[in-house]
Amino acid sequence: MELKIVNPGGAQGTVNVSEVAFGREFNQDLVHQAVVAYMAGARQGTKAQKTRAEVSGGGKKPWRQKGTGRARAGTIRSPIWRGGGVTFAAKPRDFEQKLNRKMYRAALQCILSELNRQDRLIVVESFDVDAPKTKALVQKLAQYDLTDALIVTEDLSENLYLASRNLHKVGVSDVQGVDPVSLIGYDKVVVTVPALKKFEEILG
């Protein structure tokens, strides 16, 4: 299959790409699973609370069992007391979900194919800026009429990375750094021709 190459001057060319990588039928369940697995793996998982056994103090019975008129109590660290332990205390855990390599690759194929069908995938010959300046990148994006985009290049240049840091609706990545969440999180995805070929090698 062929994809159009967009140039700032308006002239357009084409590039041949794999039908497998860019013409796959969309599988919503698979993409959902890949996105959930990726986001779960990104969780820090360091939350920790103390149970009644772990809170310091509370070893002595606060008052005798009978005769005071008050409710019976065995420890001041009961979960129903202020300063007591937590009933079902959260503990550090690993939220990572297993996703087979073939499934992950297929999910990326589905996303790229759907972006292409929705005209959200923009192929360009190359994309870079001469200086690490936000203004330079904004001007470059304006040539393609873009304000919300992920830019994917074969090798991420330092100038492009530094220029994009102050634009919260613009992301940059090399092919290896692309993930399902970033691909679906932007309005458009700009891919250079060398990056496109690398995608084919990995996914095709």
From Swiss-Prot:
Q: Name one GO biological process term.
A: translation
Q: InterPro entries recorded for this chain?
A: Ribosomal_uL4 (IPR002136), Ribosomal_uL4-like (IPR013005), Ribosomal_uL4_dom_sf (IPR023574)
Q: Cite a GO CC annotation.
A: ribonucleoprotein complex
Q: Which Pfam families match?
A: Ribosomal_L4
- UniProt-recorded Gene Ontology molecular function terms: rRNA binding; structural constituent of ribosome
Where does this protein have coiled-coil stretches?
none
Q: Where is this region: Disordered?
A: 47-69
Q: Which keywords appear in this protein's UniProt record, sorted alphabetically?
A: Ribonucleoprotein, Ribosomal protein, RNA-binding, rRNA-binding
Source domain of life: Bacteria
Q: How does it assemble?
A: Part of the 50S ribosomal subunit.
Q: Which family does it belong to?
A: Belongs to the universal ribosomal protein uL4 family.
What this protein is reported to do is described as:
One of the primary rRNA binding proteins, this protein initially binds near the 5'-end of the 23S rRNA. It is important during the early stages of 50S assembly. It makes multiple contacts with different domains of the 23S rRNA in the assembled 50S subunit and ribosome. Forms part of the polypeptide exit tunnel.
What is the name attached to this protein's record? Large ribosomal subunit protein uL4
